Amino acid sequence: MRENIKTGIKYLALFGMCFLGGRSLAAGQTVRVDGEKPCRLAILIDDFGYCGAGTEEMLALSIPFTAAVMPFSSCTTEDAERVRQAGKEIFIHMPMESLTGKREWVGEKGVFRDMDDAAIRERVKEAFSVLPDAAGMNNHMGSAIMEDARSLSAVMEVLKEKGVPFVDSMTTAKSLGKAVAAEKGVALLERDVFLDSTDSVEVVKEHLRKAGEVTLIAIGHVGPEGGKITAQAIKEVAPELERAGITFVTVSELAK
């Protein structure tokens, strides 16, 4: 769930991130698209952990992608095992406090500003204990945390220990993600642009084609924000993009 959901509109978010000439992403470095020739495309699918609509269809996709799993939800264990059985990469979709959303939307085990540093670190470590094979993390909601250097530093300290990257969903224009990640030595991938969509498969397909024009991390969802529609669009457009010379990779491959 994102914080800026417009009523009746589903979103496909695209993150600008180009892997240039085999150069690795250094800790704290954010590489943006500069009109380079398309090379690799990573798809990150949010909101696993709810047994949401489209989960089966998404996991049946033949291309590699990264599944962002809610760590403390009713269907976390079941969805995570299904992701593993499908051979897909797991990220932790970490629930974090929002500036505008209700606390209960985040859940009891989210990261909140009224927690001290030790409690935040323990909460993030608990998420990794639930999903020990997670190759990285991105924020679920989280505008309040992404603007709070102290809270965010505690999160990044655990990611540094684990040696995994963080994807900043940019739920706030005032995000301190890049600065704090650089300070803590954590590789950061930063959202570049949001694109909205309707329930039309064709519209989502056009968004994916747009992603193929520049190398991006494309973010979609299982559940009501995407689900079967997004899965169908990816299935139909992926061969077209591959014929155009684009290679699908996981998110962690872009951060190596």
Region spans (language model):
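N-terminal pre-catalytic segment of deacetylase/amide-hydrolase enzymes
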Residues: 5, 10-43, 48-57, 249
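Active-site beta->alpha N-cap acidic-glycine motif
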Residues: 34-104
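Hydrophobic faces of well-ordered beta-strands that scaffold small-molecule active sites
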Residues: 41-45, 65-67, 90-94, 137-139, ...
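Catalytic beta/alpha-barrel core
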Residues: 48, 66-72, 138-148, 163-174, ...
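Alpha-helical scaffold elements lining the catalytic groove of polysaccharide deacetylases
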Residues: 105-106, 110-129, 146-150, 179-212
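Hydrophobic, well-structured mid-protein blocks that either form specific transmembrane helices
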Residues: 117-166
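His/Asp/Glu-enriched short active-site or ligand-binding loop at hydrolase and phosphoryl-transfer sites
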Residues: 158-202, 249-252
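C-terminal domain-boundary segment and adjacent tail
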Residues: 159-171, 225-256
